[in-house]
């Protein structure tokens, strides 16, 4: 049992995120704009005509928008059965989209070097071995393709980080139903402030443009994981520099996160 718990933690709490994606499984129209901001130097339009793998696909939100943008084929991989069930439901109308159970740390060798683009949006920073996962994802990128990442930044989060970490320390240890109840209560209390406070950071300013349900899911999401890395620019340069034959472009986006595109030469 202890070994199973350690494995789940190493993989980034997939069962807890699975509960989230089964609960918040609807693909909201506003999520397209969120994704476009996370992609940074890579445009959503550039997915047209590409074969894509999304690592940590959750309920299939990102693959949905990739197909809508014109991707020729999309494979979403995740470790949690609940997440995969929600993703299958969301992608069922697309003949060129499918999902598969797989770990970012151990991707199928049969797909190595076969994708024009591999994306990992909001997942790498929750893994115990991000370097290993990066190498596995990079091995799946075809010559001339690229790897697209979105990760938490230490820059822009220094003031909020103690608050976030306090709630995360609580939420990651509570039973999932209790964490969900606490997240709902926090959202109710925070909603008036989100609407009223003139935040300087782009990310927090944009929260007021999202629906209440979306904000609730974001707060819940922040309380779930056992692992959450916040990386500096130097950290991102080190991580992306590990990839042989890669040319990284790193952008600071939304005032609190990193978007990176690493092109394979």
Locate each region found by the language model.
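Short alpha-helix
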Residues: 227-243
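A short SAM/SAH-binding and catalytic strip from SAM-dependent methyltransferases
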Residues: 117-128
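Extended, charge-rich helix/loop segments that form flexible
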Residues: 172, 176-214
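Short conserved AdoMet
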Residues: 92, 128, 142
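Conserved N-terminal segment of class I S-adenosyl-L-methionine
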Residues: 1-53, 57-113, 117, 229, ...
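Short, glycine-/aromatic-enriched active-site segment of Class I SAM-dependent methyltransferases
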Residues: 160-167, 208-228
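A short glycine-rich, Lys/Arg-flanked "PGG" loop and its adjoining helix->strand segment in the class I
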Residues: 131-143
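Conserved class I S-adenosyl-L-methionine
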Residues: 146-178
């Amino acid at each position: 049992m202890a070994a199973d718990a350690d494995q789940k933690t190493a993989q980034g709490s997939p069962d807890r995120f699975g509960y989230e994606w089964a609960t918040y499984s609807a693909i909201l129209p506003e999520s397209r704009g969120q994704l476009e901001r996370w992609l940074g130097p890579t445009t959503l339009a550039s997915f047209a005509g590409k074969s894509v793998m999304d690592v940590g696909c959750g309920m299939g939100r990102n693959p949905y928008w990739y197909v809508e943008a014109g991707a020729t084929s999309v494979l979403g991989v995740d470790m949690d059965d609940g997440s995969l069930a929600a993703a299958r439901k969301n992608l069922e109308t697309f003949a060129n989209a499918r999902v598969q159970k797989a770990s970012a740390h151990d991707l199928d060798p049969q797909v190595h070097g076969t994708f024009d683009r591999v994306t990992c949006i909001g997942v790498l920073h929750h893994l115990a071995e991000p370097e290993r996962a990066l190498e596995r994802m990079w091995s799946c990128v075809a010559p001339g393709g690229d790897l697209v990442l979105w990760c938490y930044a230490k820059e822009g989060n220094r003031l909020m980080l103690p608050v976030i970490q306090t709630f995360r320390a609580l939420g990651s240890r509570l039973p999932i139903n209790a964490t969900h109840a606490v997240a709902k209560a926090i959202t109710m209390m925070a909603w008036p402030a989100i609407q009223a406070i003139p935040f300087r950071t782009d990310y927090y300013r944009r929260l007021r443009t999202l629906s209440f349900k979306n904000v609730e899911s974001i707060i819940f999401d922040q309380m779930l994981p056992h692992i959450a890395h916040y990386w500096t620019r130097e950290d991102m340069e080190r991580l992306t520099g590990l990839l042989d034959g890669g040319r990284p472009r790193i952008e600071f986006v939304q005032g609190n996160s990193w978007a990176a595109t690493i092109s394979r030469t």
